[in-house]
Amino acid sequence: IFFLDCKDYFNVCRSAGFRPGLEVLNLKRKDYKFLTDSKDPNYKVLEYTIWGTKTKPIHKPVANSFFTEKIFPEIINRHISAELKDDDYLLFPFLKNRKRLKNKAGKLFVDISKKLQLFYRDGGTRPLYSVRHTYATELYKKGAKIDDIATLMNTSPRMVMSVYLGLTSQNNVNLHKRVYGNMKIIK
């Protein structure tokens, strides 16, 4: 069951741009709720409450819709037979040493990435934290505004641009289009 719990951990990390590690591993069963759109009661949003983040005392990210509909129910039902309480951990509910767990899950991610030849890329390595970078990049490619991405990820727009999106060729092309767009060359 440890590997299924690891899968859940990796999926939660990628669901809302979390900082992988203790912010996610310390989520309790009471730290999530479903929000409903007042205009469309069928539109559900999964909101987490994270206490004591790196940058502020409380952060409330929301998960992507696919995760909310398809993956989160699996996570909630994974330990359904156990008598879990609201104060129990959402992920790995029976393991108490969260720092050791963070290291073990991170090592597993690296080992799997190396085995699949995904760990080394563009002259660097891709540890578990790269899931956060990928989250920002994918949202940006889909047209999300940098300010919105930063809000979701509990970071600054400057950090999103300089660290998470990186200076890839395509990002520079997109930046050029936004800045210089329809400028005409004067001959």
Residue locations for each model-derived region?
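Basic, Lys/Arg- and aromatic-enriched nucleic-acid-binding interface segment
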Residues: 1-21
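The alpha-helix within a helix-turn-helix
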Residues: 13, 25, 150
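Conserved tyrosine-mediated DNA breakage-rejoining catalytic core shared by Y-recombinases
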Residues: 16, 25-73
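Key DNA-contact positions within bacterial/archaeal DNA-binding proteins
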Residues: 22, 103, 158
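C-terminal secondary-structure termini that scaffold catalytic or DNA-interacting sites
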Residues: 35-37, 95, 178-187
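Catalytic-site neighborhood detector that most strongly recognizes the C-terminal catalytic loop/helix
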Residues: 52-56, 153-178
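C-terminal catalytic core of Y-nucleophile DNA break-rejoin enzymes
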Residues: 52-77, 86-111
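Short, basic (Lys/Arg/His-rich) helix/loop patches that form interaction surfaces
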Residues: 81-89, 106-151, 158
